[in-house]
Amino acid sequence: MEKEIFYDSDGAKIRAFLATPENPKLAVIVIHEIWGLNDNIKDISRRLANEGYMALAPQLYTRNEDVLNEGNIQNVMMKVWSIPPEKRNDPNSYQQIMSALDEKGKKVAELLVLNRQKTEEQMIKDAIKAYEYVSSQGVKKIVSMGFCMGGGLAFQLATEVPLDGTIVFYGRNPQPLEAIQKIKGPILGLYAGEDPPIDAGLPDLISAIIKYKKDLELKIYPGAYHAFFNDRGRSYNKEAAEDAWERVKSFLRRVSK
């Protein structure tokens, strides 16, 4: 079964895609990439349902869906990513981009670039309410799973609620890193070998995992790039994606026992 549902969160009705078999073994909260709740995330949710799991994929852009659609986001982020890494801390670089954007583009940039932390704080609140919604459905165990931006949000969510497991696809570390001590269940981390901005955080992550004695399965795919699991994207890596999916299935079987 699959359907669109809405759940309450801080005065808003958050839209979400639900895919589930009868009598699911556990539930997975699927957190989208920077592109929002799109066909790729829905397909991943269906794949999880086919494995016997409930999958709930919230549209964490519901509050700003009038401007945060995939086309607008691509238009802005391609400009942002065109800035050389060494100039991304220079306010003048962003000012040049902002001056070339229309009003919707400027709103996207404000939400996802200039005020990203504030936006993600609200998304975490809405993800917590997704956890509460899933909990109300009678499922005994709940896992978070996220990609890119959503990987970081899935990781952060694990520091906020007692998840039974966390699956991070090339997402940033929780903030602050010490929050890892709050994580309850095991973690599966799947990373691209050619992803310097994310991979730079892995040594600190591993140190924190050791310090707080957490359960982490870490896999780095040499030669793969950020977003290697997205079969609609230019960075799709079939070999890495297939191996990662097998690891996801194995991890979920372990957690569901």
Curated annotation (Swiss-Prot):
S-S bonds: none
UniProt keyword terms in alphabetical order: Hydrolase
EC number: 3.1.1.45
InterPro entries (alphabetical): AB_hydrolase_fold, Dienelactn_hydro, Dienelactone_hydrolase-like
Residues of the active site: C148, D195, H226
GO molecular function terms attached to this record: carboxymethylenebutenolidase activity
Catalytic activity annotation: 2-(5-oxo-2,5-dihydrofuran-2-ylidene)acetate + H2O = 4-oxohex-2-enedioate + H(+)
Superkingdom of this protein's organism: Archaea
Residue stretches in coiled coil: none
Family in the record: Belongs to the dienelactone hydrolase family.
The protein's name: Putative carboxymethylenebutenolidase
Organism field: Saccharolobus solfataricus (strain ATCC 35092 / DSM 1617 / JCM 11322 / P2) (Sulfolobus solfataricus)
